[in-house]
Each structure stands twice: as C-alpha cells, then as structure tokens.
Amino acid sequence: MKAKDVETRERILAAGGALMWKHGISRITVGEICRKAGVSKMTFNKHFENKVAVAKAVLQRSVDELWNKVVEIMDRPIPFHDKVGLYIQLRLEQTEAWSQEIARELLEDSIPGMAEFVNGLRQSILDKTIAMFRHFQETGDIRRDIKPEFLLSMLNRLTETAKDRDLMALYPSFQTFVKEIMEFLFYGMLPGARA
C-alpha cells in the first residue's frame, strides 16, 4: 500500500473511531466519517466497504493496543500485585472512553455481524489472558491450585467494582480505592501479614 493510501486509511479510521466512540455505530454515517476525515465517499469506498468495516478495524486496533499495554505492564520488573493494579486501572481507562451507545451496540446484536466479530475479539483476549495466568502460575506469582478462569472472572468483577462511584467516594483518592481492591484480592478480609 502506498504511503498516501496508508495516510488516507488512517484518517478514515481516526475519524470513524472518534465518531463511533462518541455516538455509537448506528448513529453515524459514512458521509459524517468522510467529512471528518476530509475524504470523498469514493475514496472511502476504496478503503472500506461500509461503516461497519471501519468499526471492526477500529475495534481490532483498540483490542491490539490494549493487549500490547497489558503485555508491557506484565513485563515490568515490579511486584505482581502492582501489575494487577495497573491492569485494573488500564481496564477502567479503556471502558471510560466508550459511550453508553457503543457499549450497548457491542453487547447486543443490533448491528449485523458485529456481535460475532466482538465475540471473536473477546475470545482471543480471554485465551491470551488465561495463557498469561498459567505463565504466572509457572513462575510462582499465582497459586498453582487456582483455576485461571476463576481469576479472570474475579478480575472482571473487581474492575466492575472499581467503577462504583458511591464506593469510590468513601476513599480520599482513586489510587487509594484501587489499593483497597488489590489488597482485598491478595489478602482478603482477615488480618495478617502483608507482603
């Protein structure tokens, strides 16, 4: 692909992504994407079949970037519980960028073919995350007798807990709140020695 074509494709993706994250997929048009990207519809059609194709490319890129950040966090030379805290914070930042409209569209099957695509992305991330947990079991960072699928479920629930604004208001800062969540994950509610 020529440099100009790559640049044009990137402009379309950036414009489509900005509109999609703000308004959802259903409420935007190819015309709006073209105007924001500064391209004609003919140029758009040279790169993408329709707005759903743009949405899929934006989502794929978003998931790839998220996973690269997860790998970067997990490769840091810091204690494992700090890695998990950064992971939860990253997940929160990721979901804050999504409008309610896009979240609803991706969870429901309101756009033909999108639910299947999103399920494929989700399964890919789940498989990678479980493989990562197994690696940390082998290195001794996670108990070997706990199922990785259980850990994944608990992390998802803790991420949801971290979105609770009423609960967050009980703490002086978001960092203190996340620390409490992490300490609960690692040490439970019983008093005792902490690492």
Feature map (PLM): residue ranges:
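Basic, helix-initiating cap at the start of DNA-binding domains
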Residues: 1-23, 27-36, 53
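Short hydrophobic/aromatic patch on the recognition helix
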Residues: 38-48
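Hydrophobic/aromatic-rich alpha-helical bundle segments in the mid-to-C-terminal region
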Residues: 137-183, 193-195
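Short coil/turn segments at alpha/beta junctions that flank glycine-rich nucleotide-binding fingerprints
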Residues: 22-26, 77, 139
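Hydrophobic alpha-helical connector segments
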Residues: 57, 61, 68-97, 151-155
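Amphipathic, non-transmembrane alpha-helical scaffold segments
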Residues: 5, 55, 59, 63, ...
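Short secondary-structure transition hinges
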Residues: 90-128
